[in-house]
Amino acid sequence: MVTYSANYSPSFQRRSPVAVHNRRSNMARMDLNNIVGDPFALITISTSMIAWLLSFVTCVISDIQGLFPNFAWWAVGYMLCAIIGISIVLGSQTSHVYGVAIVGYLAAGLAFTSLAVNSLIYDDEASKQAAAAGFILQSMVIIVWIFYFGSSRHSSSRGYHDSMGAGKEQHHSYRNSKPISNNYGARPETTVSANQPPQMYTSAQLNGFETSSPVSGFPPTATNGADIQNRFGTTLGSQTNLGGGSTIGQDHQSTNEVSQPTEYPYRAKAIYSYEANPDDANEISFAKHEILDVSDVSGRWWQAKKASGETGIAPSNYLILI
């Protein structure tokens, strides 16, 4: 089996231009099922659209009837773009990628809607007061969105919101939406990726290995060979060429292999789908909301076990402990 170190695993190597082209062609796409099947997304988007329509229609009526603050139109247009953008993000399940940007845009939108409310709510016209009510409702939805997108994926509130869509099964590949990072962190050492440390001997153990020949790796004399056999047993003493060291390396490698864990004390739930890299036998694929058994949660990659018995490593930022 080919041995990979943590820094030279195929998962971290630069992909060929063909792979990059295929990756770009498989970018995250909008899927309305992700909104319809998620009560949180469906309720917040529907409420924001109703509030926006209320403010838009009443602003048109107020503008026709008389003087109208032009700043309110900027708030109407800005919130339309914000609602469309958030709908696309929730529909493509890329909130973990654009969450920081969304919070910034929503913070500005909250300021705009608040100023629009202040300029409309104190007027005696019913249409302007209705427009202010629409902006107030939009502000309430914005506050909920800021709390959602601004929270960590591992927070209890975010996990509760994500679990609301548990009845919706996701089959799209995680590669369509996961961020590309070259500084993700080292993976845990497994049987394939473990670095084998060099075998060390003391000076007393190396006594008898000396050779009078200046050529490195020259076969020892019969006396030295017998002494080696007495010190290390028949396995080492039976070798005729110490320079090659093939048997020594194989024996040492077999004793230093990291075995698979036998206990999985933790349970984790997948908050996003993940498709394992076909070039790396250590990774495992899993679907969204799938339950995995985890042996260690200290690193960025967790050793996990599926219900089918398949074991491997999984990225920790796509799992949440339960």
UniProtKB/Swiss-Prot annotation:
Residues 62-70, 118-129 are extracellular. SUPFAM superfamilies: SH3-domain. It is a multi-pass membrane protein. Residues 263-322 form the SH3 domain. Residues 159-184 are annotated as: Disordered. InterPro entries: SH3-like_dom_sf, SH3_domain, Sho1_SH3. Forms homooligomers. Plasma membrane osmosensor that activates the high osmolarity glycerol (HOG) MAPK signaling pathway in response to high osmolarity. This is High osmolarity signaling protein SHO1.
